[in-house]
A protein has these predicted regions:
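The feature captures the beta-strand-to-loop junction immediately N-terminal to the Walker
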Residues: 33-35
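Helix-to-loop junction immediately C-terminal to a conserved catalytic motif
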Residues: 48
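Conserved ABC transporter NBD signature motif
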Residues: 56-69
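ABC-family P-loop ATPase nucleotide-binding domains
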Residues: 78-133
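Catalytic Walker B motif of ABC-type/P-loop ATPase nucleotide-binding domains
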Residues: 146-150, 155
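Helical segment within the ABC ATPase nucleotide-binding domain
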Residues: 160-173
Length: 241
């Protein structure tokens, strides 16, 4: 379905993503793991077609990322991108005008489940409410691949539960999902595979059961990115491993 081949993205001389090759299969839910600055957001934006790779190739269903793939990939960014004077309803109309696959009826139903008033202004929303609006907009598309960049960041426990419920609801429809998150415990049981980024490089990828063994994704995260992982990387660079 989605295939990245030797993909690199540089900002000036510094690579944000370096020589990443991977393939995502249809119908699976992937956790995209890594600390801040590891290249997760850059990778997602390239897949969404918002920025271009410096080198390498990204294909979706055999087609290069571009206008032809826009309707197949939905992306929820970390930042709000609406004008403060807009209402939640206006945001839906904006999406409807921009994306042919946007379902306004589904949008209203999702807003109702998450207790959001379509008449409320964007400027009056808390960070958690804003995140729920962005989630509702993303889930109201009929894309094959849904990407969520830190959907649980900056939201309270109750809002997290609502966000997770909506993602799971959409997952049951057989869509493929790529979820960037630090809060892996919240989604652990729904993750099929994990992609681990470190300093812009693909550090590890595989089915969750194979990667974690008897442990959890949190254990895997600490192993790769915690003190032990940093020491192992330093030893390897020094030729001690």
């Amino acid at each position: 379905m989605l295939e990245l081949t030797h993909v690199t993205r540089r900002y000036g001389a510094k690579p944000a993503v370096s020589d990443v090759s991977l393939t995502l299969s249809p119908g699976k839910t992937y956790a995209l793991l890594g600390p801040n600055g590891s290249g997760k957001t850059t990778l997602m934006k390239m897949v969404a077609g918002l920025i271009r790779p410096t080198s390498g190739e990204i294909r979706f269903d055999g087609q290069p990322i571009g206008p032809a793939t826009k309707a197949q990939i939905a992306y929820m960014p970390t930042e709000s991108y609406f004008y403060p004077y807009m209402s939640i309803e206006d945001a839906g109309r904006y999406y409807r005008d921009f994306f042919e696959d946007f379902d306004m009826e589904r949008y209203h139903a999702t807003l109702a489940r998450m207790e959001l008033n379509p008449r409320d202004k964007i400027r009056a929303l808390s960070s958690g409410m804003n995140a729920k609006v962005r989630l509702a907009l993303t889930l109201s598309r009929s894309a094959k691949l849904m990407m969520f960049d830190e959907p649980l960041n900056g939201v309270d426990i109750l809002t997290r539960a609502q966000v997770v419920d909506e993602i799971i609801r959409s997952r049951r429809e057989g869509r493929s999902m790529l979820i960037s998150t630090h809060l892996v415990d919240e989604l652990e049981e729904h993750i099929d595979a994990a992609i681990c980024m470190k300093n812009g490089v693909l550090a590890r990828m595989g089915d969750r059961a194979e990667l974690v063994g008897e442990g959890t994704l949190t254990d895997l995260y600490l192993k790769i990115y915690g003190p032990a992982g940093r020491e192992a990387a330093s030893d390897a660079e020094a030729g001690q491993v």
